[in-house]
Amino acid sequence: MPELPEVETVRLGLTPAMEGFRIARAVTNRDDLRFPLQKDFVARLTGQIVTGLGRRAKYLLADLASGDVLLMHLGMSGSFRVVAADGAHTPGEFHHPRSEDRTHDHVVFDMSSGARVIFNDPRRFGFMKIFPRAAIDDEPHLKGLGPEPLGNAFDAVMLARACAGKQTSLKAALLDQRVVAGLGNIYVCEALWRAHLSPKRKAATLANRKNEPTDHALRLTDAIRAVLGDAIKAGGSSLRDHRQTSGELGYFQHSFAAYDREGERCRTDGCGGAVKRFVQNGRSTFWCSGCQK
């Protein structure tokens, strides 16, 4: 499933085509996505200007002039592509054959910018939903989410307090969207490797007896910010289904130090160990026992 960097990459790709422009036409080719599209979905979008395009955790949020918000989630295999309204491709643009299969083009927006924005999702685990901006605090998909890891509210003090007393593993705590929003398996593995912290370590060790951040918390917050920033610059990680809006592959997977590198040499200078894999809470965890303590 796309994580924060992949979703942010999509947002950056959609912004020039959507933000500040009117949805001249909205088409739904099938309504049965992960959750059925609302009956008034097309009516509430047609003619509306997208005043802003943001992101919360792994969700895209398009603010509309009407006061509504269009929430979009990519699911497992969802992707957007942006083409000219007549379907022509920009010269030099690469489109993966999967995202070009029109049988999976479920939602299409023709924008006043001249762009056609197409949501393609073979597995149909993605979804879209419209709700009033005034009700955003009560929106079930957003309610209870922790702070954004790239936002000002996220720091070592906040993370230490959120993990104080938690006897769960550090990895499990970081995957809890109530602790920090938008992190997934890939970037948690990478951040823990950069911080030299074991995924098996208890989350409580990020705080001292006064619930103040330990050195572990300081290292980890820095590592989380760094790995997410690097991944966004690289356009995300393309392991299976993720594509940028241009159809191009992200390439951060070529920089993985831990994730999906089982048996390979650890990239920490002077370590000499090898990356290991084990199943933790139903997910593969990749780490180096030699330098992650």
Curated annotation (Swiss-Prot):
Phylogenetic placement of the source organism: Bacteria, Pseudomonadati, Pseudomonadota, Alphaproteobacteria, Hyphomicrobiales
Cofactor names: Zn(2+)
Pfam families: Fapy_DNA_glyco, H2TH
SUPFAM superfamilies, alphabetized: Glucocorticoid receptor-like (DNA-binding domain), N-terminal domain of MutM-like DNA repair proteins, S13-like H2TH domain
Textual note on the cofactor: Binds 1 zinc ion per subunit.
Catalytic activity line of the entry: Hydrolysis of DNA containing ring-opened 7-methylguanine residues, releasing 2,6-diamino-4-hydroxy-5-(N-methyl)formamidopyrimidine; 2'-deoxyribonucleotide-(2'-deoxyribose 5'-phosphate)-2'-deoxyribonucleotide-DNA = a 3'-end 2'-deoxyribonucleotide-(2,3-dehydro-2,3-deoxyribose 5'-phosphate)-DNA + a 5'-end 5'-phospho-2'-deoxyribonucleoside-DNA + H(+)
Any one GO MF annotation of this record: zinc ion binding
Key words of the record: DNA damage, DNA repair, DNA-binding, Glycosidase, Hydrolase, Lyase, Metal-binding, Multifunctional enzyme, Zinc, Zinc-finger
Its job: Involved in base excision repair of DNA damaged by oxidation or by mutagenic agents. Acts as a DNA glycosylase that recognizes and removes damaged bases. Has a preference for oxidized purines, such as 7,8-dihydro-8-oxoguanine (8-oxoG). Has AP (apurinic/apyrimidinic) lyase activity and introduces nicks in the DNA strand. Cleaves the DNA backbone by beta-delta elimination to generate a single-strand break at the site of the removed base with both 3'- and 5'-phosphates.
Domain of life: Bacteria
Organism: Rhodopseudomonas palustris (strain BisB5)
Subunit relationships: Monomer.
Zinc finger annotations (FPG-type) as residue ranges: 257-293
Family designation: Belongs to the FPG family.
Full protein name: Formamidopyrimidine-DNA glycosylase
Annotated DNA binding sites: 104, 123, 166
Active-site feature positions: 2-3, 58, 283
InterPro entries: DNA_glyclase/AP_lyase_DNA-bd, DNA_glyclase_Znf_dom_DNA_BS, Formamido-pyr_DNA_Glyclase, FPG_cat, MutM-like_N-ter, Ribosomal_uS13-like_H2TH, Znf_DNA_glyclase/AP_lyase
EC number: 3.2.2.23, 4.2.99.18
A biological process term (GO) from this entry: base-excision repair
